[in-house]
């Protein structure tokens, strides 16, 4: 059988407050949705792969929870057009900021992502007093999503691993960014290579398990590919400033990407 389109059933639940973070977070909205595939829909999700063991080919139903998460971003500017946003983003990349452009109602240029508002406020103050740069704290919320999926064991495991890897990458890249900004000695490129190889391997697993990936799976594959590409650019950076900027960019890529992914499935 070939992989088809996933069917989504959403249920309303309570909502939390949202978030996401040169040297700077992300989103959180906290609602919960349920993505349900009935047993009769299993064939739409499954593709039997001869290379898999009988256990991995077996159909099962599993509940996956994508937890809510809020990052706090320092926003440098908001624009109606991409050209203006791009110009500002590049000017700040040269100074070590991510220069990440989030397409949210308008084009928002973000400098970095922080796990707490206090962290973002500390850098916001530093930018204003030491560099005469005004930045706005922009919250990017990610809703909590509960997914009840039916598919091959190998498919469900690969998807769960991809969710975990993208969240872990955002946290690890934040830690790397902080270390670089503080001038700590560390083997940055080894860490970047490890994360890039993980993203590439997970994308390959998902591609091998789905003939025609459902949209929800394809979005994860695209995000993993974008992360791998971004990390390769970071590894090839020719200066510490460019390295720090690209690491912040990749962190925001994960944080914003997963927030948008969860929000699309929320009720």
Regions found by a protein language model. Give the residues of each.
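Solvent-exposed beta-strand motifs enriched in subsets of small alpha/beta binding domains
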Residues: 22, 42-151
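Low-complexity, intrinsically disordered/propeptide-like segments
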Residues: 9, 39-40, 234
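Short charge-dense sequence patches
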Residues: 35-38, 69-78, 176, 207
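Extracytoplasmic/luminal low-complexity segments enriched in Pro/Gly and acidic/polar residues
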Residues: 211-267
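Alpha-helical segments in soluble extracytoplasmic regions
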Residues: 154-230, 257
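A detector of long soluble domains/segments in diverse envelope-associated and cytosolic proteins
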Residues: 134-140, 161-164, 168, 239-249
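Hydrophobic membrane-insertion alpha-helices, especially the h-region
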Residues: 19-39
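N-terminal Lys/Arg-rich, disordered targeting/topogenic segments
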Residues: 1-14
């Amino acid at each position: 059988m070939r992989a088809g389109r996933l069917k989504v059933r959403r249920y309303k639940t309570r909502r939390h407050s949202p978030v996401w973070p040169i040297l700077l977070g992300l989103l959180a909205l906290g609602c919960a949705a349920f993505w349900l595939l009935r047993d009769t829909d299993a064939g739409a999700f499954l593709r039997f792969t001869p290379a898999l063991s009988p256990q991995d080919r077996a159909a099962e139903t599993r509940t996956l929870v994508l937890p809510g998460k809020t990052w706090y971003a320092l926003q440098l500017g908001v624009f109606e057009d991409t050209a203006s946003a791009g110009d500002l983003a590049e000017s700040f990349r040269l100074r070590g900021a991510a220069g990440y452009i989030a397409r949210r109602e308008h084009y928002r240029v973000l400098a970095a992502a922080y796990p707490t508002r206090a962290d973002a406020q500390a850098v916001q103050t530093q930018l204003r007093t030491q560099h005469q740069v005004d930045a706005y704290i922009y919250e990017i919320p990610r809703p909590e999503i509960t997914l009840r999926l039916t598919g091959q064991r190998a498919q469900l495991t690969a998807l769960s691993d991809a969710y975990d890897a993208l969240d872990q990458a955002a946290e690890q890249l934040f830690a790397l960014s902080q270390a670089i900004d503080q001038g700590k000695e560390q083997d940055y490129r080894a860490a970047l290579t490890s994360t890039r190889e993980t993203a590439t391997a997970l994308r390959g697993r998902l591609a091998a398990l789905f003939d025609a990936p459902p949209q929800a799976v394809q979005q994860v594959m695209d995000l993993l590919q974008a992360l791998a590409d971004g990390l390769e650019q970071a590894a090839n950076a020719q200066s510490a400033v460019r390295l720090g900027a690209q690491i912040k960019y990749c962190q925001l890529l994960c944080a914003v990407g997963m927030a948008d992914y969860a929000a699309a499935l929320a009720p």
